[in-house]
Structure formats: structure tokens, C-alpha cells
Swiss-Prot record:
GO terms for biological process: mitochondrial fusion. This is TraB domain-containing protein. It comes from Mus musculus (Mouse). The modification Phosphothreonine is found at residue 64. GO terms for cellular component: mitochondrial outer membrane. The keyword Manganese does not apply.
Length: 376
């Protein structure tokens, strides 16, 4: 806060500029730290935070500023998920604006990446194992689980090419948010199972086959320069957009609907903050909040478009019942899967049996058994 410190005996209130709006925030007065009240301690930390918050922050060009109806401000950092520059942009933005809330493009099913070390995450991201497939199928069902694994294969391909783990900007946001007093950390993305189930429901059987084929045979080389050149449109999302461009319904469920959900979560976070009161007799004091959103660059235009519109997220949180063709294709895929599995087990068992029987020891035992039969 600007201005001179007042003597301890003078109780006064000084307006503090936060996010461009002047609000009355009680000044914390000097005194014995042992006798400071909880309210005074809160106000002291808040004052320190507001002093660090820049009225005219120097922000990266990847930041879009939005203003809520109550004056709260949202700084949306558009990122490339495999970019060192994006990590630096996130750190700089959080340090400049000292937010009250940080919202990231993650859901509870991906929150584990926030606390993994880089080496472990890099190893995990490169591996697309049978265990991961089983977990995805248990969590999302057969078709959605297989689709999730195919998309993980895309991410693993980029990870392998770049030697860089995904989600670095989210981990940086998590670390920086923990350094800002009273800063909350929100998960702002729609749950993965809902997204994949709605995506699968939007495709016909042949569209699913065509998409799976494209994902299975992805092998184009990628360099770090490619990532930075794609800063205006996230590399992972650009690759996905190229593959799903001919499937408008899939683009709607994976991109457009999540734009709506992310916008809703950012608006929920951007609410005026009520300051604590020393007693119930004191009037309520509120200040506009400051929010930093960390999302893929491809979602920024959709968030801007939806910011001032009425949003209904209930309809994008439900999974429509499968159509007749969908049920038929599901049965066909399951039958093909288990048929292939059964044939593979039969073929392996037969080969193993023939191999065992061809061993000299096995032939000797069979000969002894044959000689021991009565009547021979």
C-alpha cells in the first residue's frame, strides 16, 4: 500500500487499489506480535500481498485479461503443454498479479501430475502399458478407455520426441500459488470420463475406426522449435485438431464443450472476497478478486467468446444413452476383442504344448507310459 505509516494509536482505513478498483482495506497497525488478533494477522498478510500486486502488471503476450461483472479480473495464460516458455509465462503472471485463485486445465483424474517429480512423470508419460489400459477401461468403459489410451499414445509420442514431460506449466502454477498468501488452487477442467464418454457417443462406428487408425499410426517427428512455433495454438491440441477436424461432433465434445466448462469455472472463481471482521458490529467489506487461469492456447478464443454469455454446464455433464448402432458396434468390438484374445490364448497354448512334447524328456516319458499300458 502506498503512503506513510500512521502512528499505532490512530485507527484509520486507507483505500487500496486491487485489480483496478479502490476498496477500503483496514490498515494493520504496529504492535506486539504476541497480542495480534487473527483479523489483524490476516489483514497484515493481505496488505503485504496487495503491495506486491502490480496495478499495471507487465504480462506476457500470451495472457488475455477478462473482467467480471463485479470488477474481479481474470488473467488467462494461454500455454503450449510442452513448452519451457509457457512455464516462464505462468510464473511471471502469478508473481506480477499475486492472485487470490489459480485455476488450471486439470481435473481430479489428472491431479497426480502436480506432485510427481519430472523424471517419474517423464517415465510415466512415455509408457502406454497394459496396466494403464485396464485402468482406463475400468474407469471409463471399454470404448472410452480405448479412446483414452489412443490419446495417451499421442501424448507419449510427443514426450518421446521432445524428452519433455507434459503439464510443466500446471506444476509451476501449483508451486507459485503456494507462495502467494491466501491463494486457492482450483481444478477447472471437466472430468475425463465425461469427456471421453460424450466423445465416443458422438461418433459412428466407422468414425471410431477411422480415428483409431489415425491415432495408432502417428509417427511424425517433432522438435522443440515446432512446439515454440505452435505457441499461438498448443501443439498437442493442434495435432488433435488436425486428426479430428473431419469429425465436427468430436471437436465439439473435446474442445468446444470444455471451453464452456473452463469459462464457467473461471467465472465461479472470480467472485468478490469478503474480508474478515473483528466483530459482527463491523460492516462487511469486500474486494474484487484476482484470478489466474492456466489453459491450453487452443481454449483461449472459446473462453473469450463464452465469457459474457449465459452458461448451462448441466447439459455437457451428462452422457447420452448409446444409439442402436452404438450398441451394436459396442457388442461387435467386445466380441472381436474377446475372440482375438481367445484365439491368441489357444494359439499360444497349442504352440507351447507342441514345444513341450518335442522335448526329448517329454518323448521319453510318453514312450514309457505307452510301454507300461496293459496288453502291449
Amino acid at each position: 500500500m502506498e503512503g506513510e505509516e500512521k502512528p499505532a494509536q490512530e485507527a484509520d482505513v486507507e483505500p487500496v487499489v486491487t485489480a483496478g478498483t479502490s476498496e477500503a482495506v483496514p490498515r494493520v497497525l504496529a504492535g506486539d506480535p504476541q497480542n495480534i488478533s487473527d483479523v489483524d494477522a490476516f489483514n497484515l498478510l493481505l496488505e503485504m500481498k496487495l503491495k506486491r500486486r502490480r496495478e499495471r502488471p507487465n504480462l506476457p503476450r500470451t495472457v488475455t485479461q477478462l473482467v467480471a461483472e463485479d470488477g474481479s479480473r481474470v488473467y488467462v495464460v494461454g500455454t503450449a503443454h510442452f513448452s519451457d516458455d509457457s512455464k516462464r509465462d505462468v510464473v511471471k503472471t502469478i508473481r506480477e498479479v499475486q492472485p487470490d485463485v489459480v485455476v488450471v486445465e486439470l481435473c481430479q483424474y489428472r491431479v497426480s501430475m502436480l506432485k510427481m517429480d519430472e523424471r517419474t512423470l517423464l517415465r510415466e508419460a512415455k509408457e502406454v502399458s497394459l496396466e494403464k489400459l485396464q485402468q482406463a477401461v475400468r474407469q471409463n468403459g471399454l470404448m472410452s478407455g480405448l479412446m483414452q489410451m489412443l490419446l495417451l499414445k499421442v501424448s507419449a509420442h510427443i514426450t518421446e520426441q521432445l524428452g519433455m514431460a507434459p503439464g510443466g506449466e500446471f506444476r509451476e502454477a501449483f508451486k507459485e500459488a503456494s507462495k502467494v498468501p491466501f491463494c486457492k488452487f482450483h481444478l477447472g477442467d471437466r472430468p475425463i470420463p465425461v469427456t471421453f464418454k460424450r466423445a465416443i457417443a458422438a461418433l459412428s462406428f466407422w468414425q471410431k475406426v477411422k480415428l483409431a487408425w489415425g491415432l495408432c499410426f502417428l509417427s511424425d517427428p517433432i522438435s522443440k522449435d515446432d512446439v515454440e512455433r505452435c505457441k499461438q495454438k498448443d501443439l498437442l491440441e493442434q495435432m488433435m485438431a488436425e486428426m479430428i477436424g473431419e469429425f465436427p461432433d468430436l471437436h465439439r465434445t473435446i474442445v468446444s464443450e470444455r471451453d464452456v466448462y473452463l469459462t464457467y469455472m473461471l467465472r465461479q472463481a472470480a467472485r468478490r472476497l469478503e474480508l474478515p471482521r473483528a466483530s459482527d458490529a463491523e460492516p462487511r467489506k469486500c474486494v474484487p478478486s484476482v484470478v489466474v487461469g492456466v489453459v491450453g492456447m487452443g481454449h483461449v478464443p472459446g473462453i473469450e467468446k463464452n465469457w459474457s454469455t449465459d452458461l448451462n454446464i448441466q447439459e455437457i455433464m451428462t452422457v447420452p444413452p448409446p444409439s442402436i448402432s452404438g450398441r451394436v458396434s459396442r457388442v461387435a468390438v467386445k466380441a472381436a476383442f474377446f475372440g482375438l484374445l481367445g484365439y491368441s490364448l489357444y494359439w499360444m497354448g497349442r504352440r507351447t504344448l507342441n514345444l513341450v512334447l518335442s522335448l526329448p524328456a517329454a518323448q521319453f516319458c510318453l514312450q514309457r507310459v505307452s510301454e507300461a499300458r496293459p496288453g502291449r
